[in-house]
């Protein structure tokens, strides 16, 4: 897991940066760790139920280390979000597929768990509410749709937009993050590949 925050001036509104452009290229997919089979699970179909549970538990332990490696970045992100909340801003998650569903889940859980107003933590998912229960294929590959969907929330400089993309290169999220930057919002990327 990697957390990156940014409050950058956009010198070229409407233009995708070289770094963002390299993230969109399809040829990157075959080399990304998140897109490969995990070496421990290549024969999972031959494991007993107990072996599967033990394997999942062993691999889940990696999550603790991944979060531990990002403590400073996570704490810095929390401080920015707290400051933006104090300014009347919102936390807005953006994602596609499972990443989007996790953003929606967290946004839905904040009001009952932390007594936040429903509009304080929001989520945008590629494919809209239908994508919560059924895959909506192809939308994740459209950066302009991510920008449009996020734009429906009237993003401001007090908002924080978190793009969640396991691969770190989902075009829908990149388009939404670019739109957020154009609006002056603070942006955070939550990704699982070191190179993205």
Per-segment meaning from a language model:
Residues 69-84:
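A short, well-structured juxtamembrane/interface segment
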Residues 65-72, 134-138:
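Short, surface-exposed alpha-helical recognition segments that flank or form part
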Residues 92-196:
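Glycine-rich phosphate-binding loops that contact phosphosugars or nucleotide phosphates
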Residues 10-12:
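Intrinsic-disorder-associated, low-complexity terminal segments enriched in Asp/Asn/His/Tyr and depleted
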Residues 89:
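Glycine-centered, small-residue-biased loops immediately flanking beta-strands
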Residues 85-86, 181:
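Anion (oxyanion) recognition and catalysis
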Residues 5, 14, 18-66, 70:
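Cofactor-/ligand-binding subdomain signature composed of acidic, glycine-rich
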Residues 44-48, 73, 138-145:
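Short secondary-structure boundary/capping elements
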């Amino acid at each position: 897991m990697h957390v990156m925050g940014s409050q950058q001036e956009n010198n070229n509104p409407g233009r995708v940066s070289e770094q963002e452009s390299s993230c969109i290229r399809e040829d990157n997919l075959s080399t990304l760790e998140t897109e490969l089979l995990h070496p421990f699970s290549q024969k999972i179909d031959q494991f007993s139920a107990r072996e599967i549970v033990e394997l999942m538990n062993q691999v889940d332990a990696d999550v603790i280390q991944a979060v531990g490696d990002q403590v400073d970045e996570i704490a810095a992100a929390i401080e920015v979000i707290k400051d933006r909340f104090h300014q009347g801003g919102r936390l807005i998650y953006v994602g596609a597929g499972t990443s989007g569903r996790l953003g929606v889940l967290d946004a839905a859980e904040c009001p009952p768990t932390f007594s936040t107003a429903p509009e304080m933590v929001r989520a945008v998912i590629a494919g809209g509410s239908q994508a919560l229960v059924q895959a909506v294929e192809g939308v994740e590959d459209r950066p302009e749709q991510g920008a449009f969907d996020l734009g429906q929330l009237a993003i401001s400089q007090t908002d924080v937009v978190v793009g969640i993309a396991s691969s770190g290169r989902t075009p829908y999220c990149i388009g939404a993050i670019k739109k957020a930057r154009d609006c002056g919002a603070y942006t955070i990327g939550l990704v699982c590949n070191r190179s993205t």
